[in-house]
Every structure is written in C-alpha cells, then in structure tokens.
A protein has these predicted regions:
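An N-terminal, well-structured beta->alpha segment
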Residues: 1-64, 68-69, 146-166
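N-terminal small/polar loop signature for handling phosphorylated ligands or for N-terminal nucleophile
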Residues: 44-108
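Residues on a specific face of well-ordered alpha-helices
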Residues: 64, 82, 86, 123-130, ...
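Flexible glycine-/small-residue-enriched beta->alpha junction loops
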Residues: 93-145
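Single conserved hydrophobic/aromatic residue that forms the stacking wall/gate
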Residues: 167-175
Length: 175
C-alpha cells in the first residue's frame, strides 16, 4: 500500500483509519522517524496513544517500526498528550510520539512528534520517507519497555502548584 502525501501536515500527520493511515503505513512512518532519531543521536522514544479504537493497533505497529530500526521504545500506553510531552521532556531525551486523532472525527487518527524538544512537521517525515529511510542501515532490534508514568506526572503537577487562599473582608455576602 502506498502512502498518501496529504496525511502529512504542517504540524502533524493525520488521516482516516484504515484508508489513509493504517498499520502498514504507520510502520513506514516509524522507520522514517527512526532515521531522524539516529541523525540526532536519540536512542529512546516515549510513545503513547489516546483512546481511539484504532490507537492500540497503530501504537503497536509504530513501536514495531521503531524497534526494527534500532530505536528503544518506552510505551507509556493510554495517556493524554500533555502526559506524553512530560514523559518525553523528563525521561526520554526530550523526544516522544503521540498516536492521536486529536479533535478530528472518530475515523481519523494521527501522530504528533517532538524530537530534541522540538515539534517535527509531518512534511519533514514525508521527505525522510522519500529520501532517507531507504538508506537506513538495519540495526539490531531494540527493546520495548512499558512504563506507567502517571504517578510521576501527578506528583510533578502537585509539587509545582502554589495554591494561595485569599481572605478578604466582605468577600462573600449573604445578601
């Protein structure tokens, strides 16, 4: 199956499942992202997904593509995008990928990426698919680990909240 170039957007990758974005396509995209990771000396990516029905299958195919290309995967599972970005920033070379359809209709899914703390454009990944990923040396398969990062995220959020209660006279009036 060929890859439809229209799924590669300025800030992400989005397409209908399974017509435009499916397991075969997403594995090829993962291989291209691995090319970028190798160029930037990134050895591990945090990878998560949202709750869409196609999410788990696409996440597994994506991880398979990364591992085949020698990138270690920390699968953080079903999470929100902010939690994925937290995991990427705090624990994974400031790099991660979120499988998410975002605000699109339920038959869509997609990919948001950050490598070295910078968002990666879908159009850049298309260029890598066209030019670079075919040249990627095949590495020894990497590994996949599974981490529940939610507790670390919650602790970080609560440890950085400064709640200030303001008491003033006549703040509430019973009239």
């Amino acid at each position: 199956m060929g890859i439809t170039s229209s799924i590669f957007r300025e800030y992400d990758i989005r397409g209908t499942y399974p017509d435009e974005l499916n397991e075969e396509v997403i594995e090829q995209i993962a291989f291209a992202i691995a090319t970028k990771c190798h160029k930037e000396a990134i050895g591990t990516l945090a990878v998560g997904r949202d709750g869409r029905l196609s999410g788990e299958s696409l996440l597994n195919a994506f991880c398979k593509g990364l591992v085949k290309a020698g990138i270690k995967v920390n699968n953080i599972g079903l999470v929100t995008s902010p939690l994925l970005y937290f995991a990427a920033k705090k624990e994974h070379s400031k790099s991660g990928v979120m499988i998410t359809g975002s605000h699109n209709p339920k038959n869509y899914n997609g990919i948001k990426m950050v490598i070295n703390d910078k968002p990666v454009a879908g159009t850049e990944i298309l260029s890598l698919i066209d030019n670079e990923s075919k040249k990627l040396n095949i590495f020894k398969d990497a590994e996949i680990t599974f981490t529940d990062i939610k507790e670390n995220y919650i602790n970080e959020v609560f440890n950085n909240i400064n709640i200030c209660l303001l008491y003033t006279s006549d703040a509430a009036d019973d009239t």
